[in-house]
Amino acid sequence: MPKRQDIHKILVIGSGPIIIGQAAEFDYSGTQACLALREEGYEVVLVNSNPATIMTDTEIADRVYIEPLTVEFVSQILRKELPDAILPTIGGQIGLNLAMKLSNTGILDELGIELLGTKLTAIDQAEDRELFKNLMQKLHEPVPESAIANNIEEAQQFADKIGFPVIIRPAFTMGGTGGGIANNEKELAEIAENGLNLSPVTQVLVERSIAGYKEVEFEVMRDAADSAIVVCNMENFDPVGVHTGDSMVFAPTQTLTDKEVQMLRDAALKIIRALKIEGGCNVQFALDRNSFKYYVIEVNPRVSRSSALASKATGYPIAKMAAKIAVGLHLDEIKNPVTKKTWAEFEPALDYVVTKLPRFPFDKFENGDRTLGTQMKATGEVMAIGRTLEESLLKAVRSLEVGLIHPERPAFAKLSDDELSKQIIQANDERLFYLAEAFRRDYTIEEVAELSKMNPFFLDKIKHIVELERELAAHKADLGLLAEVKRYGFADEEIAKLWGLHADQVRQMRKEQKILPVYKMVDTCAGEFASDTPYYYSTYESSTESVKSDKPSVLVIGSGPIRIGQGVEFDYATVHSVKAIQKAGYEAIIMNSNPETVSTDFSIADKLYFEPLTLEDVLNVIDLEQPEGVIVQFGGQTAINLAEPLANRGIKILGTSVEDLNRAEDRDLFDQVIKSLKLPQPEGGTATDKAGALAVADKIGYPVLVRPSYVLGGRAMEIVHDATELDNYIDRAVSVSHDHPVLIDHYLVGKECEVDCISDGDTVVLPGIMEHIERAGIHSGDSMAVYPPQTFSQDIIDQITDATIKLSRTLNCIGLMNVQFIIHAGKAYVIEVNPRASRTVPFLSKVTNIKLAQVATLAILGLSLKEQGFETGLLPNQSGIHVKSPVFSFSKLNHVDSLLGPEMKSTGEVMGSDTTLAKALYKAFEAAGMHLPQFGRALITVKDADKAEATALAKRFREVGYQLVATSGTAKAFEKTGITVSTIEKLDSGQETILEDIANRKIQLVINTMSADKKVSSDGFRIREAAIEHGVPLMTSLDTAGAILKVLELQAFSISPIKS
């Protein structure tokens, strides 16, 4: 059937900010879908709240709205735009839930708007746990014994009937949010309460636990003519019980027989047909290891994390195809854009093994609960491709960027056998490394399988890697063995370690012996048809499929997996850099390892290498491609860390030179730059040991800000108030950055701001200045930022502009540079310079309408800023007021303190724009999911230093209609100024009233600035944890509370009696 002619304008709903469970895969799928619809001639209107995405660029849709994804705002857009249809299936769970809510309000019927792709009845049947169970029973597809519960009592009754353990799955949530495995009544009550709170329909499914079964996923597509295909099947390394987003995943399935694959394939196709899904869908199965018994776990009736992985694993662009199916095209009418010869109805075939590894945030949250279960905890993921499972797995481990090039944590060698066994039994984020350690101690496969409940096939592969390590250690410089271990994915650095050499010597040895990688193409058809996709992976075989072109090329290093501190913002900059390289007439080559992102879409660069971002892997690509140079400034710290080792090996780094990068990153060199320019800077110093650190702090006076050098996202950065705290900090955190000293600065209290500038070595352009709402001491990535600044005098703006231009010129910056300032006593103090793209580049690009990364790339490639139409200085402010607000994922992680400080904790961002600051703030809070009640009870408990300021805020909260509750010290301060307040006992008095009131929704807002006691048992920590667990808005900064008051005051009308 040809595409539909009766619809012309389509509204696409994006997926909002990046949170755990919903990451960059939706930027990738959303971008693909919008472009596919435009390709077919439709007018596309996009709404999304996340400015850090390619999807929200003006070229992606005909009109782009960066607005909160709420019924209130999207309804406004629907009334204004009057689209014919909505495509809700590519915005993740957020998009689906919003479509359901809009439908329930009646606005879609009122305006005659239809939903494309998957119908609401299908979404309901797949997402509503009871309807899904009924459908499966009708199809005779087995599901685990289960019951629907709408309250805790119902959940307990069913658990008593079938016995523990049970799995709890909330309805209409994503990433397993609110779910878990309960082993007893206490755990059941906790998980069920949380799940009911987080489910938008207050419903959970309680089911018999089938933990231990194999978990298998099928990615399927169907069109309106009922043609259906399997795009990819995948098998989880972890058995059922660990969320698939937190499990290692292999594609295609590795341990299933043909009969099992066909059985599950038939079931998946039967389910997608019964649901009448038009587009992509993900079906998850649990398969018994010892029989042909299986259960259907769940169905996602939309584009998902797994479909992004399947797209990159096979080269088959699922979201693009789903969008075309949604407008009526059939699979046999759509060309496969990879081969450009076959049709989309051909099922992809793989002649390689793909491994996906999750990337967890526990390097940021040392106290976090690392146990893995049905609720997802990973922030991102990496993918690697190899010809053997071992090669694919080892490449994935190097891609993770957790300081390892091989599955070996040296510290684990010190564990006792009991401790090691305990870690293997319990699924956690480092289980792979514990399993490898067990084989190094000669545990048998049977012993490890018994402890871990893992499939012996996978354990055998890990054991094989350990056996090869032993072979290497026993046969130093054996060239035959060298060729063999390279085929199994061993890194030069690991071989060098076992042979007592330097990695460069192993590399040299390989080159002399012609043991070199070749590059194979990902072509969707296992080489059956000729393909011209420029999408490659390395392996050690004989023939290569990647041929260097005659055109001069530039290599851009991507930013690797998404993690806290290095998010999708850097992928955004990478993609824009590629566009500019192509505009300048060069061939653009990308190297990256992240399957979720737009940069690894095969249609973006002229060539894509899906490879780990390590020195060895990058040098291998450079050897083949011989680029004019390498651009590192858009890939975050991942790429910057490669600059020096590449330059040392004679590779040309384009943009700011390595020497100048070092002058900005090395503390002593940077101090010299600041002194030579006579710029104000907080007093500080460096130390390489504890005694030196204590001496520096003593000299400059407490409080001090301490951090290691060369880090991103404020890793291991803290504000320290006395010598004891400093002593503790050095014992805990200083090993974070080997070879680099600790930096210690006097901590100034003041307004913070930052600026991104572009320079060509002469002209320096400042597109805009962003003022932070939270004062200095909270990481810039966790602060709300406002453009243009609202409270700075012209004198301060001039100081910032002047200092930025001087710094840029002195550091010989070519490309982008980010500078952060504290405004203290009328002076702009420089606190940090980052000579690269920062995480504010997308936000600033959107609000100033200047594509910063493209302008910077053209400058790097030699097109001066004057030729691009720019002069030195700060550009005039654009219209409107724009607020960038951080978004956190604390509700997904247990035992993680939400108190904000100098170490970054947010996973994503949203933007609110309007004509006044209060309105822009309101939109930013709504977009970030912080829905503020206009009245209620506010619990305020603050440290002594904040009491005066908190009193002024408390008065304003009373005026807008809030009742106040405070702990005794804070309450006394309020009562002194005549504020009405109820006193509540502190937790250490043995009373739990505070926590009970939060749990029972008797508190609508919590403001808590109690000290960052590292103890998880402290009062402040427990209050903050309770607020997050029960979804009560929580502020840990008085500045954020002040911003919220601006919004509440905007909404409140003044009421006062008439004067007598």
From Swiss-Prot:
Residue numbers binding ATP 1: R129, R169, G175, G176, R208, I210, E215, G241, V242, H243, Q284, E298
Cofactor note text: Binds 4 Mg(2+) or Mn(2+) ions per subunit.
KW Magnesium (keyword) present: yes
Segments for region (Carbamoyl phosphate synthetic domain): 547-929
Span of domain MGS-like: 930-1060
Pathway involvement of the protein, from the record: Amino-acid biosynthesis; L-arginine biosynthesis; carbamoyl phosphate from bicarbonate: step 1/1; Pyrimidine metabolism; UMP biosynthesis via de novo pathway; (S)-dihydroorotate from bicarbonate: step 1/3
EC number: 6.3.4.16, 6.3.5.5
Stretches the record annotates as Carboxyphosphate synthetic domain: 1-401
Gene3D superfamilies: 3.40.50.20, ATP-grasp fold, A domain, ATP-grasp fold, B domain, Carbamoyl-phosphate synthetase, large subunit oligomerisation domain, Methylglyoxal synthase-like domain
Region feature Oligomerization domain, mapped onto this chain: 402-546
Gene Ontology CC entries for this record: cytoplasm
Protein residues bound to Mn(2+) 4: E832, N834
Residue positions binding Mn(2+) 2: E298, N300
Record-listed Mn(2+) 3 binding positions: Q820, E832
Positions that bind Mn(2+) 1: Q284, E298
GO molecular function: ATP binding; carbamoyl-phosphate synthase (ammonia) activity; carbamoyl-phosphate synthase (glutamine-hydrolyzing) activity; metal ion binding
Amino acids binding ATP 2: R707, H746, L748, E752, G777, I778, H779, S780, Q820, E832
Annotated keywords: Amino-acid biosynthesis, Arginine biosynthesis, ATP-binding, Ligase, Magnesium, Manganese, Metal-binding, Nucleotide-binding, Pyrimidine biosynthesis, Repeat
Binding site for Mg(2+) 3: Q820, E832
Swiss-Prot/TrEMBL domain comment: The large subunit is composed of 2 ATP-grasp domains that are involved in binding the 2 ATP molecules needed for carbamoyl phosphate synthesis. The N-terminal ATP-grasp domain (referred to as the carboxyphosphate synthetic component) catalyzes the ATP-dependent phosphorylation of hydrogencarbonate to carboxyphosphate and the subsequent nucleophilic attack by ammonia to form a carbamate intermediate.
Subunit structure, as described in the record: Composed of two chains; the small (or glutamine) chain promotes the hydrolysis of glutamine to ammonia, which is used by the large (or ammonia) chain to synthesize carbamoyl phosphate. Tetramer of heterodimers (alpha,beta)4.
Reported function: Large subunit of the glutamine-dependent carbamoyl phosphate synthetase (CPSase). CPSase catalyzes the formation of carbamoyl phosphate from the ammonia moiety of glutamine, carbonate, and phosphate donated by ATP, constituting the first step of 2 biosynthetic pathways, one leading to arginine and/or urea and the other to pyrimidine nucleotides.
Protein name, as recorded: Carbamoyl phosphate synthase large chain
